Amino acid sequence: MTRAALEDACSVLDYFRVTDGEVTSFLTQKSGEASFCTIADEIPYGAHKLYFIGHKSEVTDFENGVASFDKVTDTFSYALSLEVNANTESVQPIELIRNVAKLELVAVDALPDNLATVEFTITGADKNLDVDTGLGETENTQVKTIQVPETNLGKTNCTFAAYTFLLEEESSIAVDFTAKDKDGNIIVSHTFENVEMQTNFISRITGKVFGDQFGFSITASTEWAGEIDYEF
């Protein structure tokens, strides 16, 4: 991934050096900085583990190679084991790899005038990233709430999205989708069981969300690695 491509996908690049199980160096860069995508670190001789994480969030905790975020966004990472000695190359090229699966719900019918928020509740995946494996660490419940701009009300074919870290490269998740008005009253809710997901893929659920009758088809976007289709 080029610097320009990474800046488009990520706003933050975090670097951690771990030596003997302890974080011995930490650096955060933000897109727009002249040094973005160029990490300089005086690494002493010995064995080290280097972690690189690109995202649009904030790492709230990093321990044993597992990163926790305040929210899950498009995320790329790489873990490098490096033995530093007199013969070690001073420049190490790093290619970050996308770690998330993306879920999209497309409402083909018009958004109701009283819609204020939509909420995804995802089970069967993780909101934390094990950078060594590139996968989630343990199963937990992830909730994402999206504020709906008033300018979108009445529009059709609106897309709502959430990212998650799968526990395996390919796995199934359960998704509860809930739409609410400004007072928190539920307008409509849908549950989708066994939604097939894959890291670096977009699984897309498309259908009439707010009507009395609804039907859904599920696809995955080739803008990433591929597509997954479902019909209900």
Regions found by a protein language model. Give the residues of each.
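Tryptophan-paired
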Residues: 5-65, 114-199, 226-232
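Extracytoplasmic beta-rich ectodomain segments of secreted or membrane-anchored proteins
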Residues: 99-106, 111-123
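Short coil/turn motif common to extracellular beta-sandwich-like domains
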Residues: 1, 97-102, 170-172
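Short amphipathic, basic-aromatic surface patches that mediate peripheral association
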Residues: 1-6, 107-110
